[in-house]
Amino acid sequence: MNIENIRIAVIGLGYVGLPLLVEFGKHYPTLGFDLNQERIHSLKQQQDNTLELSSEELASAVKAEYSYTATDLNDCNVLIVTVPTPVDHHKRPLLEPLQEASRTIAPYLKADDIVIYESTVYPGASEEVCAPILEEISGLSASQKNDPGKNQCG
């Protein structure tokens, strides 16, 4: 993958995803994807109803676009999933948002695409829960290139 050909997608435009989108969108073509149509419409008007970012901060992302249409993910080759990972009353993570995001992006994956999960789940969740969904739906084979949570010091 060549840096000139990078097109980033940030899936989930909450308190983690939206600032990430803005920073990438200052330099690279970046698609902000969220299923909440009202959120997308307000962001297109440079209004963040959560008040995390100002209109000026949103406007600084000159290469950012917004969409709630999954087919727009087809043009992206770096996909960063930033959906919430709530916990149940026993403090166990609810993985449904990650699973649903994986099902949403999988049909649009191509060989050599990069998928990053920015999440607060237990170590191995991406590999154990999300990768099988991506592989089954996309027909591709996932490989874990880098796991910043693993201790590689000897």
For each feature predicted by the language model, list its residue ranges.
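Conserved NAD(P)H cofactor-binding loop of Rossmann-fold oxidoreductase domains
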Residues: 83-84
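N-terminal Rossmann-like NAD(P) cofactor-binding module of classical short-chain dehydrogenase/reductase
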Residues: 79-80
